[in-house]
Amino acid sequence: MNKCAIILAAGQGTRIKSKLPKVLHKACGKEMVNHVIDAMRNAEIDDVNVIIGKGAELVKERTTSRNVSYSLQAEQLGTGHAVKCAKDFLEGKTGVVAIFTGDAPLIKPETVKNLVDTHINEKNSATLLTSVIENPTGYGRIVRNGESVEKIVEHKDCNEQEIKIQEINAGMYCFDIESLLTSLEQLSNDNAQGEYYLTDVIEILKKENKKVGAMITDFEETLGVNSRAELAKVESIMRNRINRTHLDNGVTIIDPLNTYIEPEVVIGKDTIIYPGNVIEGKTVIGEDCVLYPNSRINNSTIGNGVEIQSSVILDSKIGDETTVGPFAYVRPESNIGEHVRIGDFVEIKKSTIGNNTKVSHLTYIGDAEVGERCNFGCGTVVVNYDGKKKHKTIIGDDSFIGCNTNLVSPVEVKDNTYIAAGSTITKEVPEGSLAIARAKQQNIEGWVERKKLK
């Protein structure tokens, strides 16, 4: 059977108090609406339509990579009106449509799939996603007749018996497309708010003796975000889910409450993560690594057996058995080899560092190719920028760079060379050479006495 989905993402979200449309606020590094789109995709629903309104162009910009279509709700007149705006998307289609909100990022793909499967297997015209909660105050109650849904009653309209019902409407649905389109034509905005409500479709279907069912899920999954506090709550739940998955897969997380891992991160078993680490994007971390406190790793590949201390690694690759930090900064497009030492207060920018090379402290390497088994003394600077352009430096294997050396790019240092401490290198250093480029020391005896500087 054909399946499609509609995601409601047109509202501004005034209570979140932001210039940014509500659905574009991030939970664990990903926009809420993209969490929902990805849940649809992972539930094997490829045809997804996003209802846009406030900040429409920005929402399109942030979701376009997910290959979705869009329907515009220029004026926000309720959930029923939002779905009516997707009429062009639905017309000509057969099968079922899942309808979810773009501000409920905790929904799981398996829940979406189960809802759709339940709807199809029970041959329903509509199937609601519901939850059972201890305190349902403020929520619409699900009134059942056996297994089927009889009606949804808003809290303020509940009678003495209905007020005791703990099953609530989550605001997420699966509909038979033909039944939905027919019912949408009958929707009325004859209410205090002057809006069209999707819940009224259920009443219309029941009047036509159509079958309406419901599937209960964990209330946590259905949580929507209307404020910064609710966003923080949702992110906390999501972070706990992510961390629990890694724990179950053999990763040690010393303090899960203070470890921040985004959903697409992959971590190998027997890796140990201390508190304060932030691991973002599509980072892949190998096995047997140790991430000591307070590092940030973004969109990077970390090999096996790597140790990282209080450092920042962005869009780069770190080889096996390498150590980084403390307080190192590995900038984008850097490729650090195996068994390398990147020490304290070292900055690497868009450079390749060969295996077994040591850059132990207080060094800047930018736009460089560094060979294997090199050693950089403290205070080395690759001077890659002339004020207008960046230039490249090449350093061969087995080179020793003395302390306080400046390598003025573009320049090449051949294999097996030594550069004396304090040198400023502006020309090629031949293989097997010692390069000394500093002023000759001159001692002027009696100078202090004569100048009376004591």
From Swiss-Prot:
Ranges where the record places region N-acetyltransferase: 250-454
Residues engaged in binding acetyl-CoA: 384-385, 421, 438
UniProt KW keywords: Acyltransferase, Cell shape, Cell wall biogenesis/degradation, Cytoplasm, Magnesium, Metal-binding, Multifunctional enzyme, Nucleotidyltransferase, Peptidoglycan synthesis, Repeat, Transferase
A Pfam entry, by short name: Hexapep
Keyword Acyltransferase appears in the UniProt entry: yes
Binding site for Mg(2+): 103, 226
InterPro entries reported in the protein's UniProt record: Bifunctional_GlmU (IPR005882), GlmU-like (IPR050065), GlmU_C_LbH (IPR038009), Hexapep (IPR001451), NTP_transferase_dom (IPR005835), Nucleotide-diphossugar_trans (IPR029044), Trimer_LpxA-like_sf (IPR011004)
Pathway: Nucleotide-sugar biosynthesis; UDP-N-acetyl-alpha-D-glucosamine biosynthesis; N-acetyl-alpha-D-glucosamine 1-phosphate from alpha-D-glucosamine 6-phosphate (route II): step 2/2; Nucleotide-sugar biosynthesis; UDP-N-acetyl-alpha-D-glucosamine biosynthesis; UDP-N-acetyl-alpha-D-glucosamine from N-acetyl-alpha-D-glucosamine 1-phosphate: step 1/1; Bacterial outer membrane biogenesis; LPS lipid A biosynthesis
SUPFAM superfamilies reported for this sequence: Nucleotide-diphospho-sugar transferases, Trimeric LpxA-like enzymes
Domain of life of the native organism: Bacteria
HAMAP family (UniProt xref): GlmU
Family under the similarity heading: In the N-terminal section; belongs to the N-acetylglucosamine-1-phosphate uridyltransferase family.
Purpose of the protein: Catalyzes the last two sequential reactions in the de novo biosynthetic pathway for UDP-N-acetylglucosamine (UDP-GlcNAc). The C-terminal domain catalyzes the transfer of acetyl group from acetyl coenzyme A to glucosamine-1-phosphate (GlcN-1-P) to produce N-acetylglucosamine-1-phosphate (GlcNAc-1-P), which is converted into UDP-GlcNAc by the transfer of uridine 5-monophosphate (from uridine 5-triphosphate), a reaction catalyzed by the N-terminal domain.
This protein's name: Bifunctional protein GlmU
Gene source species: Clostridium perfringens (strain ATCC 13124 / DSM 756 / JCM 1290 / NCIMB 6125 / NCTC 8237 / Type A)
High-level lineage: Bacteria, Bacillati, Bacillota, Clostridia, Eubacteriales
Encoding gene (name): glmU
